């Protein structure tokens, strides 16, 4: 980001009206978005509202107080209750900006319609601007007022805008540390969305509730809500990715590592390329889960573009687990303790200590056909008061779980390893190929389900028999008309 700033050229001094020249372009875009929302509301076309929201997100970096205020004057009736409320959240402008807004409002006027969609869009625009300007107290007040207004509206075209309002409503309270205050309100909104069959709203609110619970480590409540909430086909890819990520976190805490790994990897794979921060979080949890499963992630996972720095602590952790060095594992855990605490993965890393010991024991079992338990304790660097007894207990448990193929000679205090057999004579290669084939088939099915088809296309298709009958009738009719013409002639 710093590099981009340095590469920019210094603009030449512009005349005094250059400030006003940049403002109408942004305002003009907002006016086009307003007309798009208006046409979508009249035609009841939800796709146009979705497109308007996407265009707004692209414009958010260009917003300023004068542009937002001018758009409010353009789309709402000046002096109305909604206009006065939204204008009160915006910062006061200087006289120059006020003159610019007045001039633009005078040149182009909109026939003011009491469209609920346009009113909700104004709430959304002001809320986005306040959050970007870090005016969180005003954003909380604006979001609360917008939610109170949305509760009284039951229109399909409003649901798209309402889902975005729900997100920023939760975000504004999260940024001020008051996320617990709105949990009851989010549950009430989810109930209203369910009664109105608003599937997009249900999807968004379920994710916000899961995020709310997980923020306070209420994993049991989150799982109860998730299991009882209605599920249906995803309407938003972003919301589906968030759901998979939260599901992966819940499954990880519940020790269901296989399901957690699948959810976290699927969320990272489905996430948009621009959502780098989200994909980084998904990869962090996926790495931890794979380590807990006894797998070692590939080096390419940590070398993904834009993720090298964020995943460096987890790379060093993976290296310690791969080697089975307990001392190196402790050093990495202590060095990056603040990072792991911020990522909320510190408790999971504590669980990895057992995996490190088991990996080291497996390496010892492969390297030595017979080794004393004293040497095993020394190589594992066990720091307990009675390391030999602990080593014997660890080896016994590993043999029972099938992690190593060995026996214990209690009389002499040895661990005797058995010869390793041919892995290709077992079912492991078949299971590995089966998992890869299932993964490819699932990806193909998801890609097919994600395709868009024209509405009622199956009704427009004409069977071959009907086509032949129609053509035959047309030929007979043409022949009959020709015969009548001959008779008249």
Curated annotation (Swiss-Prot):
Residues 1-23, 454-489 are annotated as: Disordered. Keywords: Nucleus, Proteasome. The keyword Nucleus applies. Residues 241-422 form the PCI domain. One of its GO terms (cellular component) is proteasome regulatory particle, lid subcomplex. InterPro entries: 26S_Psome_reg_C (IPR013586), CSN3 (IPR050756), PCI_dom (IPR000717), WH_DNA-bd_sf (IPR036390). GO terms for molecular function: enzyme regulator activity. It is found in: Nucleus. Coiled coil: none annotated. Residues 457-482 have a biased composition (Basic and acidic residues). The keyword Nucleus applies. GO terms for biological process: regulation of protein catabolic process; ubiquitin-dependent protein catabolic process. Acts as a regulatory subunit of the 26 proteasome which is involved in the ATP-dependent degradation of ubiquitinated proteins. The 26S proteasome is composed of a core protease, known as the 20S proteasome, capped at one or both ends by the 19S regulatory complex (RC). The RC is composed of at least 18 different subunits in two subcomplexes, the base and the lid, which form the portions proximal and distal to the 20S proteolytic core, respectively. Belongs to the proteasome subunit S3 family. This is Probable 26S proteasome non-ATPase regulatory subunit 3. It comes from Daucus carota (Wild carrot).
């Amino acid at each position: 980001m710093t590099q981009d700033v340095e590469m920019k050229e210094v603009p030449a001094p512009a005349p005094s009206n250059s400030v006003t020249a940049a403002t109408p372009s942004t305002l003009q875009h907002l006016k086009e978005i307003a007309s798009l929302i208006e046409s979508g509301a009249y035609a009841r076309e939800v796709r146009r509202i979705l497109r308007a929201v996407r265009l707004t997100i692209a414009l958010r970096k260009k917003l300023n107080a004068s542009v937002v205020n001018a758009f409010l004057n353009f789309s709402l009736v000046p002096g109305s209750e909604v206009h006065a409320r939204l204008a009160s959240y915006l910062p006061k402008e200087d006289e120059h900006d006020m003159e610019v807004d007045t001039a633009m409002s005078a040149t182009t006027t909109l026939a003011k319609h009491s469209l609920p969609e346009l009113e909700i869009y104004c709430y959304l625009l002001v809320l986005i601007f306040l959050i970007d300007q870090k005016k969180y107290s005003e954003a909380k007040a604006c979001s609360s007022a917008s939610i109170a207004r949305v509760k009284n509206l039951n229109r399909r075209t409003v649901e798209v805008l309402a889902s975005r309002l729900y997100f920023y409503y939760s975000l504004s309270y999260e940024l001020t540390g008051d996320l617990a205050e709105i949990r009851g309100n989010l549950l009430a909104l989810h109930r209203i969305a369910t009664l109105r069959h608003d599937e997009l709203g249900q999807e968004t609110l379920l994710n916000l509730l899961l995020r709310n619970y997980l923020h306070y480590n209420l994993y049991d409540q989150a799982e109860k809500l998730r299991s009882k909430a209605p599920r249906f086909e995803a309407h938003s890819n972003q919301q589906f990715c968030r759901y998979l990520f939260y599901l992966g976190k819940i499954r990880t805490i519940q020790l269901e590592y296989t399901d957690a790994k699948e959810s976290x990897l699927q969320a990272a794979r489905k996430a948009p390329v621009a959502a780098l921060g989200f994909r980084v979080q998904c990869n962090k949890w996926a790495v931890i889960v794979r380590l807990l499963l006894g797998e070692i992630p590939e080096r390419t996972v940590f070398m993904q573009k834009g993720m090298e720095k964020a995943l460096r602590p987890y790379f060093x952790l993976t290296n310690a687990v791969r080697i089975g060095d307990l001392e190196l594992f402790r050093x990495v855990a202590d060095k990056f303790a603040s990072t792991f605490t911020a990522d909320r993965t510190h408790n999971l890393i504590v669980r990895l200590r057992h995996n490190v010991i088991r990996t080291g024991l497996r390496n010892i079992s492969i390297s030595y056909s017979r080794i004393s338990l004293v040497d095993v304790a020394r190589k594992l660097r066990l720091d307990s008061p009675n390391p030999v007894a602990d080593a014997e207990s660890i080896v016994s448990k590993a043999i029972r779980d099938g992690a190593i193929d060995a026996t214990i000679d209690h009389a002499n205090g040895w661990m005797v390893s058995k010869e390793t057999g041919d892995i290709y004579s077992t079912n492991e290669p078949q299971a590995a190929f089966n998992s890869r084939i299932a993964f490819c088939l699932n990806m193909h099915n998801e890609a097919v389900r994600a395709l868009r088809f024209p509405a009622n296309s199956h009704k427009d298709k004409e069977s071959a028999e009907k086509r032949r009958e129609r053509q035959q009738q047309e030929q007979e009719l043409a022949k009959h008309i020709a015969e009548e013409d001959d008779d008249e002639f």
